[in-house]
């Protein structure tokens, strides 16, 4: 089990909240500000992805901006003896729409199977296509089954669920 998986499964730290930031919805700088706000509000994992309207460059720029902001806040907190310096420990994990939206800067990737998709691309195709990149970049894969219960939304339409 990798660092991100261990972090997710560690019961000693209690309940955690994760926020999903879609790179297509804002600039990387705005995404970084939203991630910082979420971290200050108690989120303990940042998921990046989920959109059909983004590409590898946008995802990468967003993850880099978020990680730089979290590291800067963590460093600043380390200079203040009264502050808690844990923002740099928040993992930034890919929640990709597919193999065309990956980044080597991520701490991990939700390697997911859309379990009720009628399209083999979302059952195994995207995973097979993205696996060489994930391995080469050293990104920790986090296995995940994804089930869409009401296929009226965009994810259900795109994933043919």
Where are these regions (language model features)?
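N-terminal amphipathic alpha-helix/helix-capping segment at the start of soluble metabolic enzymes
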Residues: 1-21, 126-143
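Structural preference for beta-strand elements that scaffold enzyme active sites
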Residues: 16-20, 45-47, 89-93, 108, ...
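Short, glycine-rich nucleotide/cofactor-binding loops
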Residues: 21-27
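Generic structural signal for hydrophobic
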Residues: 37-38, 66
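Glycine-rich, proline-tolerant flexible connector loops at the mouths of alpha/beta enzymes
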Residues: 45-62
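Conserved anion-binding
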Residues: 95-161
């Amino acid at each position: 089990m990798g660092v991100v998986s261990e972090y997710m499964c560690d019961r000693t730290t209690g309940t955690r909240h994760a926020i999903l930031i879609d790179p297509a919805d804002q600039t990387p700088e705005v995404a970084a500000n939203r991630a910082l706000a979420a971290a200050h509000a108690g989120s303990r994992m940042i998921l990046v992805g989920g959109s059909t309207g983004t590409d590898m460059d946008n995802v990468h720029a967003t993850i880099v901006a978020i990680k730089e902001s979290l590291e800067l806040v963590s460093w600043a907190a380390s200079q203040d003896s009264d502050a808690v310096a844990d923002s740099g420990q928040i993992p930034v994990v890919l929640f990709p729409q597919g193999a065309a939206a990956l980044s080597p800067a991520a701490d991990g990737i939700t390697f997911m199977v859309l379990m009720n998709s009628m399209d083999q691309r979302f059952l195994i195709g995207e995973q097979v296509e993205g696996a060489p990149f994930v391995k080469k970049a050293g990104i920790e894969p986090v296995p995940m089954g994804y089930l869409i219960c009401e296929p009226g939304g965009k994810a259900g339409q795109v994933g043919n669920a």
